[in-house]
Amino acid sequence: AMALVDSEELSVDTEASAASLAHAGMEVDLGAVAKGFAAREAEAAIRDAGGTSAMLDLGGNVTVIGTKEDGSPWRVAVKDPRDTGSYLCVLALTDVTLSTSGGYERYFEEDGVRYHHIIDPETGYPADSGLLSVTVVSADHLLADALSTALFVAGPEEALDFWRSRDDF
């Protein structure tokens, strides 16, 4: 299966609005950005309809538009991956999206081993980066969604180095 994992084998023709993969059996999984895309489109529809205050919760991706009706920021809790009934912190947010990726909700167990859904493209197995979850806050929905997954796979040191090198999340 790893022979079929290579993003360089995806060809995109923007003029024709077409994409192709080099080998039979290859697939594109948009799971790392699908909710970000949906949130972006939903926010645009709300704003186009005149909406100025809303919270969209897409399960792991939360978008806040404006402030609450009383003018205060939206308060968004970040789940504790060790105890999903509680939270690590509560963030006061306005006009941003928050995306959390982790292996604590979508998984299966086989022979006493837990396998979560975030795959490391280098190994073909669930990412084992030492992180339990990553939360990214940004005005860019797709960026937040993609980075929460990518930084989860990357691990703590690489994720922190990347975060320190940027100013857009």
Task: Tell what function each PLM region has.
Residues 1-169:
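Mature catalytic core of soluble alpha/beta enzymes
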